[in-house]
Amino acid sequence: PPHEKPPHENTPPEYQPPHEKPPHEHPPPEYQPPHEKPPHEKPSPKYQPPHEHSPPEYQPPHEKPPHENPPPVYKPPYENSPPPHVYHRPLFQAPPPVKPSRPFGPFPAFKN
């Protein structure tokens, strides 16, 4: 009696149910939705923004540079002041005494 049951009732019922579902209901629904959206709604809007940004970005930098350059001419009064003139002299006199020691200047003297 134990020889006619195990080899007969164990194989057929376990091999039929998992074979008709996974390979049939999975591939079709997963391959359709992603095929009609990405290749259609992505390339279109992504190619337009970079085209409309170029023209407006080239105009603003063209009207400003030529306008902000002339104002720097107002710097003369800054050089006439005594503070900026006195500060430049002491900074330039410090390196002279180090020059005779070496022909390189302040570089080798700083290490000494």
Swiss-Prot record:
Residue ranges annotated as compositionally biased, kind Pro residues, are: 68-85, 93-106
Biological process (GO) annotations held by this record are: nodulation
Q: Which UniProt keywords apply?
A: Nodulation, Repeat
* Start and end residues of each stretch annotated as Disordered: 1-112
Domain of life here?
Eukaryota
Spell out the Basic and acidic residues composition-biased ranges.
17-67
Tissue expression pattern: Nodule parenchyma (inner cortex) of root nodules.
Q: Does the keyword Repeat apply?
A: yes
What this protein is reported to do is described as: Involved in early stages of root nodule development.
Give the record's family classification.
Belongs to the nodulin 75 family.
State what protein this is by name.
Early nodulin-75
What broad taxonomic lineage does this protein's source fall under?
A: Eukaryota, Viridiplantae, Streptophyta, Embryophyta, Tracheophyta
